[in-house]
Amino acid sequence: MEAKQADLNDREALRNAFTAVDAVINRAGYYPTVPRPWRDEVQTAKAQMQNFYDACTHLPLHKIVYLGAAIALPRDPTGRPGNEEPRYRKQPDKKSPYLQVKWALDEQALTMAQQGLPVTIGIPTMTFGEFDPGNTTGRFIIELANRSLPGYVNGRRNVIYAGDAGRGLVRVCEAGRPGERYLLAGENLTMEALIGKVAVTVGAPMPKAIPLNVARLVSAWQTFRFKLGGPEPKVTDSAIAVMSLGQFIDGEKARKELGFHPEVSVDDAIARALKWFQGNGLVKSELKS
């Protein structure tokens, strides 16, 4: 495997990056971080990915792996763990930019596969580990360690170690079938249980659960303040979506078809991520030894 970088807005750079390779794993999926209208976010995300797919069409690639998101899968109406098969019949009603972007990119990937590109979708669940800049899921560890996490919204999640997710994506590239999704799943946990594990690891008090409607009001106020020139919101729409719109996940398909089994526990994943954050100056509070 070889890591290459290219700007998704630069088609020539993408084509040059893909020279002399026979497969590509795209780990640059768009992630809304700063408040913008959801339609603008979707337009940007799809345009960038279309540049990627257009570059791929000119090359003899045997596999293209899009790194998807579990939120793009509709929840099981019976409450059972979700799997790869369900697909929204229409655009999701909730206008969360994160949900809308990930749904649109999932649909785009499936469409490209139907049009003949060898696109396979690998979907790691909520990921913790090293080499995280801390602006997505790693924020839960960083902010709780720094005593700056305002609270959490309860919900259902599946959590996997980043290294295991990486191995899984390689297996998707090696053995996944074009046009198929593969969930790379770890442990099913409520957000309350997950935040509790993080709190124990960093030696911080357990933060309070925030009702979903309260979190949305806080996010709306902070977004309004940001648009008037204030600081970036701490309670973002994307963070609320990550916490509240998830579901437990069934990873049986990847186990059967790819032989994928996670090896690192959630506790170890949190500890490894924390050590990396400490070593890179992202955690500043004094921690429990």
What is each residue range found by the language model?
Residues 1-47, 55:
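NAD(P)H-binding glycine-rich loop region in Rossmannoid oxidoreductase-like domains
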Residues 44-97:
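Conserved Rossmann-fold NAD(P)-dependent oxidoreductase catalytic core, especially the SDR/UDP-sugar
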Residues 90-92, 140-160, 164:
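A conserved pocket-lining segment of Rossmann-fold NAD(P)-dependent short-chain dehydrogenase/reductase
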Residues 104, 135-136, 153-174, 180:
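Substrate-positioning beta->alpha
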Residues 68, 107-130:
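Conserved beta-loop-beta element that borders a ligand/cofactor-binding pocket
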Residues 168-234, 251, 256, 265-288:
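Mid/C-terminal beta-alpha module of Rossmann-like enzyme folds, strongest
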Residues 33, 70-81, 127-134:
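Conserved catalytic-site region of short-chain dehydrogenase/reductase
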